[in-house]
Amino acid sequence: MVSMTTSSSSYGTFSTVVNSSRPNSSATFLVPSLKFSTGISNFANLSNGFSLKSPINPGFLFKSRPFTVQARAAAEKTVHDFTVKDIDGKDVALNKFKGKVMLIVNVASRCGLTSSNYSELSHLYEKYKTQGFEILAFPCNQFGFQEPGSNSEIKQFACTRFKAEFPIFDKVDVNGPSTAPIYEFLKSNAGGFLGGLIKWNFEKFLIDKKGKVVERYPPTTSPFQIEKDIQKLLAA
């Protein structure tokens, strides 16, 4: 026999389902009732099961699964805990960006979105870099093979054609078995309606001054559309 009870909390309404039809089964699980809204502070996320963005801290995903020691450790991890390689192959500890707002983007040189995104990213970086804003660009060749060049070719393209001054890093995979650890972290902390996979070039993650993922934007969201969200975090 399956029974269901409903309870409410500040995080939403949950139904507790109990299956007592089998003698040796006492499994229960929570089914959250989600209210969907948009905006940087009110975004309901669904990733690897049901999850909610906490009203107390919009950058934290409150999941229905048991909060284990491992889950707690993962929740406490930030972008600042990672070390990546730059476009020249040198290690860069991301804790150097503590106290700064970051926009992390997977870029490509031969995409239909390349020109508009690089131009707008360069404009935003020039406008806000002295206020504590950083853009971290990660080249990726997984979408239509649109970033086939070497690191030196990618660097020359971005810096010569678009005058990009923001940091560009080593080419990475953002999906699949060879996914870069930084992208595993980004996706697990901001699954959202986009799901676990990066969908295309120029998907964007906005990071607050503490290294927490605040928002995720699809490739079709232009950098200029994110400007107000950047301003809010810089002012915080």
From Swiss-Prot:
Induction per the UniProt record: By salt stress, osmotic stress, metals and heat treatment. Up-regulated by abscisic acid (ABA) and auxin.
Annotated EC: 1.11.1.12
Active site annotation, chain numbering: 111
GO CC terms of this entry: chloroplast; chloroplast envelope; chloroplast stroma; chloroplast thylakoid membrane; vacuole
Keyword Zinc in annotation: no
Family: Belongs to the glutathione peroxidase family.
Official protein name in the record: Phospholipid hydroperoxide glutathione peroxidase 1, chloroplastic
Organism from which the protein derives: Arabidopsis thaliana (Mouse-ear cress)
Name of encoding gene: GPX1
